[in-house]
């Protein structure tokens, strides 16, 4: 039939149940995981301590 697919049509187990390209929920979880990973990388590089230059001996 035409229209959105029903979740009962797909029988996924394991991680495929939450991350797949067949259901709207699965696609949403993939997008959220991608955006979350990118946000964590940005935060890591923004908040990590800055390296101070070594003291030069004169």
From Swiss-Prot:
Q: Where are the transmembrane segments?
A: 23-45
InterPro entries named among the record's database cross-references: ATPMK
Q: Which UniProt keywords apply?
A: Acetylation, Membrane, Mitochondrion, Transmembrane, Transmembrane helix
Chain positions found as N6-acetyllysine: 16-17
What is the annotated tissue distribution of the protein whose record heads this document? Ubiquitous. Highly expressed in skeletal and cardiac muscle. Moderately expressed in brain, thymus, stomach and testis. Lowest expression levels were detected in lung, liver, kidney, adrenal gland, spleen, small intestine and adipose tissue. In streptozotocin-induced diabetes, the insulin-sensitive tissues skeletal and cardiac muscle were down-regulated.
Superkingdom of this protein's organism: Eukaryota
Kindly indicate whether the keyword Nucleotidyltransferase belongs to this entry.
no
Identify its membrane topology class.
Single-pass membrane protein
Keyword Iron appears in the UniProt entry: no
Q: Which GO CC terms are listed, alphabetically? A: mitochondrial membrane; mitochondrion; proton-transporting ATP synthase complex
As for subcellular location, the record says: Mitochondrion membrane
Role description:
Subunit k, of the mitochondrial membrane ATP synthase complex (F(1)F(0) ATP synthase or Complex V) that produces ATP from ADP in the presence of a proton gradient across the membrane which is generated by electron transport complexes of the respiratory chain. ATP synthase complex consist of a soluble F(1) head domain - the catalytic core - and a membrane F(1) domain - the membrane proton channel. These two domains are linked by a central stalk rotating inside the F(1) region and a stationary peripheral stalk.
Query: Whom does it interact with, and what assembly results?
Result: Component of the ATP synthase complex composed at least of ATP5F1A/subunit alpha, ATP5F1B/subunit beta, ATP5MC1/subunit c (homooctomer), MT-ATP6/subunit a, MT-ATP8/subunit 8, ATP5ME/subunit e, ATP5MF/subunit f, ATP5MG/subunit g, ATP5MK/subunit k, ATP5MJ/subunit j, ATP5F1C/subunit gamma, ATP5F1D/subunit delta, ATP5F1E/subunit epsilon, ATP5PF/subunit F6, ATP5PB/subunit b, ATP5PD/subunit d, ATP5PO/subunit OSCP.
> What is the name listed in the Swiss-Prot or TrEMBL entry for this protein?
ATP synthase F(0) complex subunit k, mitochondrial
The organism is: Rattus norvegicus (Rat)
């Amino acid at each position: 039939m035409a229209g959105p697919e029903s979740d009962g049509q797909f029988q996924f187990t394991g991680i495929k149940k939450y991350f797949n390209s067949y259901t709207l929920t699965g696609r949403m979880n993939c997008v959220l995981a991608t955006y979350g990973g990118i946000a964590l990388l940005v935060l890591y590089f923004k908040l990590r301590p800055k390296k101070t230059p070594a003291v030069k001996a004169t």
